[in-house]
């Protein structure tokens, strides 16, 4: 393959989250395909011949047939736990969603920081050996979020479905010693909401019902500015109650569950976790940095990822950070409206830069050095 051809193909950007796969072409301003990273397998025996039943469904198709499927997420806490399913997800992304041949386009993948090294190597191996990519690259999610917000300095709180992490970046350099990771994100909040709803007498048990609860969380959840005060309001009036219609037409009412769910981000003890909340994690991350760069980090708190989409999270974060930081410190929380996809957008920006062309891991380099090349070439 001569170099001229290689320049032609538009790079693919694929952000494999624990909850959603965001995929598309570099240079676009939004991902073409966004679908749940779910693989569903039938729970029952097929009896009707000629229905074209499959042994596995991926993404939206699995979501729409969830009533008869067992749903599994191949990515947990940002780490791929089931590679066979992950291959199915990638296959679906390339051939059904984007409709391109992966052997013709370079592919930029994303990864959570502090992931096991084997995870990257296996990703690299599958891309080159199963999909025959001409070139690929693995990038840290939070760094891409910062690209998308147009900054070179800031601390990114990236909270998705499986993992939250804080990454301080100064003048384009990430500070690896100050990166903190918190295995508390959207999926834990969904599970917690399932438990809280059970206390109210609404039983949600199966993998399909969890998806309903996730929808309730996304549509009705919010972050209270003052949790105790909000609990009082909820107890004394019905102003906070909202109703939700289930797929079968039943209408349920939810009150204080709306903000109790998201409160677990700030008080992980609700989930029985002994870790610091997201605000303390950001603070601890800043305190691990050099004393000279802290001021700039406080003034550039960038939120990204789907779990930061709760209404009220910016104000609450501001309030919590102000109480933790020194009193004279200027604190700014940046919550861009497109933050649900900011990681993908950053990848799209990065992969379309002309200077990035030299960064790709080429197939020839992989053939020479094996999967370990990914640690040399990718930060």
From Swiss-Prot:
CDD domains: ASKHA_NBD_actin. Signal peptide: none annotated. GO terms for molecular function: ATP binding; hydrolase activity. Keywords: Acetylation, ATP-binding, Cytoplasm, Cytoskeleton, Hydrolase, Muscle protein, Nucleotide-binding. It is found in: Cytoplasm, Cytoskeleton. Its main location: cytoplasm. It catalyses: ATP + H2O = ADP + phosphate + H(+). The modification N-acetylaspartate is found at residue 3. It holds the Pfam family Actin. It is an enzyme of class 3 (hydrolase). Residues 1-2 form a propeptide. Its EC number is 3.6.4.-. InterPro entries: Actin, Actin/actin-like_CS, Actin_CS, ATPase_NBD. GO terms for cellular component: cytoplasm; cytoskeleton. Actins are highly conserved proteins that are involved in various types of cell motility and are ubiquitously expressed in all eukaryotic cells. Belongs to the actin family. PANTHER family: ACTIN. This is Actin, muscle. It comes from Branchiostoma belcheri (Amphioxus). The lineage of its organism: Eukaryota, Metazoa, Chordata, Cephalochordata, Leptocardii.
């Amino acid at each position: 393959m001569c170099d001229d051809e290689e320049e032609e193909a538009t790079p693919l950007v694929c952000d494999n989250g624990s909850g959603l796969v965001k995929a598309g072409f570099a240079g676009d301003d939004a991902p073409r395909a966004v679908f749940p990273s779910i693989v569903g397998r039938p729970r029952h025996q097929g009896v009707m011949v000629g229905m074209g039943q499959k042994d596995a469904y991926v993404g939206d198709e699995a979501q729409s047939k969830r009533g008869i499927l067992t749903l599994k997420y191949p990515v947990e806490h940002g780490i791929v736990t089931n590679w066979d399913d992950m291959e199915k997800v990638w296959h679906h992304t390339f051939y059904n969603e984007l409709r391109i041949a992966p052997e013709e386009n370079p592919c930029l993948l994303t990864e959570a920081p502090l992931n096991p090294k084997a995870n990257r190597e296996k990703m690299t191996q599958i891309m080159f050996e199963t999909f025959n990519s001409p070139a690929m690259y693995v990038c840290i999610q939070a760094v891409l979020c910062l690209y998308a917000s147009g900054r070179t300095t800031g601390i990114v709180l990236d909270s998705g479905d499986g993992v939250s992490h804080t990454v301080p970046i100064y003048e384009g350099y990430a500070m690896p010693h100050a990166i903190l990771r918190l295995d508390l994100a959207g999926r834990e909040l969904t599970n917690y909401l399932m438990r809280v709803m059970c206390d109210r007498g609404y039983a949600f048990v199966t993998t399909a019902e969890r998806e309903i609860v996730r929808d309730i969380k996304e549509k009705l959840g919010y972050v209270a500015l003052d949790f105790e005060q909000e609990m009082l309001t909820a107890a004394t009036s019905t102003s906070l109650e909202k109703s939700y219609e289930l797929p079968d037409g039943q209408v349920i009412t939810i009150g204080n569950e709306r903000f109790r769910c998201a409160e677990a981000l700030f008080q992980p003890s609700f989930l029985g976790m002994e870790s610091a909340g997201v605000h303390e994690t950001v603070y601890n991350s800043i305190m691990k940095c050099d004393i000279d760069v802290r001021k700039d980090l406080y003034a550039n708190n960038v939120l990204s990822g789907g779990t930061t989409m709760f209404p009220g999270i910016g104000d609450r974060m501001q309030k919590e950070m102000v109480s933790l930081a020194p009193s004279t410190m200027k604190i700014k929380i940046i919550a861009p409206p497109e933050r649900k996809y900011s990681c993908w957008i950053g990848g799209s920006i990065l992969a379309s830069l002309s200077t990035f062309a030299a960064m790709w891991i080429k197939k020839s380099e992989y053939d020479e050095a094996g999967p370990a090349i990914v640690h040399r070439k990718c930060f």
